[in-house]
């Protein structure tokens, strides 16, 4: 891991609606931090495809009005 990442801390930033998310964002799903790979929208919600630190793929579905925890790296 690079020295830059080692000096940064992962912090909770906000609860976001799926329409506020974008590819590359870090979210928390089932007590695991994952990166959003792809988002697709249909008539009532969003398919969100993710990848974890072990390179395992995942999928969640969120309705338009659901929120999810969004995390960012914060430099100390």
Q: Where is each model-derived feature located?
A:
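Mixed-charge, Lys/Arg-rich low-complexity intrinsically disordered regions
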Residues: 2-22
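Intrinsically disordered, low-complexity, charged/polar segments
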Residues: 2-4, 8, 57-76
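Extended hydrophobic/Leu-rich segments
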Residues: 5, 10, 34-36, 48-49, ...
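Short, charged beta-turn/beta-strand-edge "cap" motif at the junction between a beta-strand
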Residues: 16, 32-35
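Short, hydrophobic/aromatic-rich segments at coil-to-beta transitions
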Residues: 22-24, 46
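Generic structural motif
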Residues: 32, 39, 53, 65, ...
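Basic/aromatic-rich interaction segments and small domains that mediate binding to polyanionic partners
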Residues: 37-62
């Amino acid at each position: 891991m690079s020295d830059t990442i080692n000096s940064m801390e992962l912090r909770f930033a906000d609860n976001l609606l799926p329409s506020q998310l974008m590819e590359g964002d870090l979210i928390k799903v089932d007590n695991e931090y994952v990166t959003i790979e792809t988002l697709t929208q249909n008539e009532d919600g969003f398919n969100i495809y993710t990848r974890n630190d072990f390179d395992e793929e995942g999928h969640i579905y969120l309705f338009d009005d659901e929120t999810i925890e969004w995390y960012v790296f914060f430099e100390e």
